[in-house]
Each structure stands twice: as structure tokens, then as C-alpha cells.
């Protein structure tokens, strides 16, 4: 699914496909994300802004919303959102990425509060710190990647 262009019916179809194949869903790990531009807000391209918001904030919301009925069928389902340090302490030039991560942190709280007394679905947000990815290399081009943990190394945080 292309999160930058996905429409509601695509999320609905995904839920239908999962239901037909598995009957329930045990968890979602929202790890898809794009950086966008590291540039002053006054110069930020509106199309890039929209794409970052669609991938980093709208897609996790839409996926969780559409898959929630399947999550509620599982005995102990979990939704994990991923954030970043800029999600709670914005830094200059991080633009749409920082705003989307702040939104993710609030979205996590909203889902957790709304589901706390009505289901067994757990909702959490994790900031895994720096992770060796292409996006990290784009954001920090002078950083030595050997000093940054890989996705495999941080996976225990999510289990």
C-alpha cells in the first residue's frame, strides 16, 4: 500500500483481506515514515509537507482505525506507534517530520485513553532513538553509521 496516496477504500480492503485470511489481528507496528525536507518552514514545499503528513500521521491513524475491529478480536492485541525526539522537543528545520511525530504522540494518548476501559488492545508509543536507516543517514550525513544501532538491535524494545 502506498501511504502517500492511499484512500479510505484501500484501508477498508486491507482490513477485509486480513479478516478473510486470519480472522483477527494481534498487533500493528507503525514504523513506516519519511523525513521530508530539513529546511526552514518559510521555505517548506507544501506538497512535501502533505506527503510527510500522509505517510507519518494519516496512515497510522487510518490503519489503526480500520484495523481496530480485528485487533479487538485478539486476546491481547497491541498497537505500537513510533516517535522521535523531535516529536516532543521540536528542532529548527525538522518541519513536517517533527509536527507529524508530535501528532503521533498525541494520537497514541487518544487511542490509549479511548480503548483503556473498552477493550484489551494496548496502545503505546516508542522512541527507539537513532536507528541505522537510510532516513537517518539523510538526516545526519556526517554521522558514523557504525555508532548507530541497526533495526535488528533495537527490536527487543518492541517485543
Q: Where are the language model's segments positioned?
A:
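Conserved NAD(P)H cofactor-binding loop of Rossmann-fold oxidoreductase domains
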Residues: 31-37
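Rossmann-fold cofactor-recognition segment
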Residues: 1-8
Amino acid at each position: 500500500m502506498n501511504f502517500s496516496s492511499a484512500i479510505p477504500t484501500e484501508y477498508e480492503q486491507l482490513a477485509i483481506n486480513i479478516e478473510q485470511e486470519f480472522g483477527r489481528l494481534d498487533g500493528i507496528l507503525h514504523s513506516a515514515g519519511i523525513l521530508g525536507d530539513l529546511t526552514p518552514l518559510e521555505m517548506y514545499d507544501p506538497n512535501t509537507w502533505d506527503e510527510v503528513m500522509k505517510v507519518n500521521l494519516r496512515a497510522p491513524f487510518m490503519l489503526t482505525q480500520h484495523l481496530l475491529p480485528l485487533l479487538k478480536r485478539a486476546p491481547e492485541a497491541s498497537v505500537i506507534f513510533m516517535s522521535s525526539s523531535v516529536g516532543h522537543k521540536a528542532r529548527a528545520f525538522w518541519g513536517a517530520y517533527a509536527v507529524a511525530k508530535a501528532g503521533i504522540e498525541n494520537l497514541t494518548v487518544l487511542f490509549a485513553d479511548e480503548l483503556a476501559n473498552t477493550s484489551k488492545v494496548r496502545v503505546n508509543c516508542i522512541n527507539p532513538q537513532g536507528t541505522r536507516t537510510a532516513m537517518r543517514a539523510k538526516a545526519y550525513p556526517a554521522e558514523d553509521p557504525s555508532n548507530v544501532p541497526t533495526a535488528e538491535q533495537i527490536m527487543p524494545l518492541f517485543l
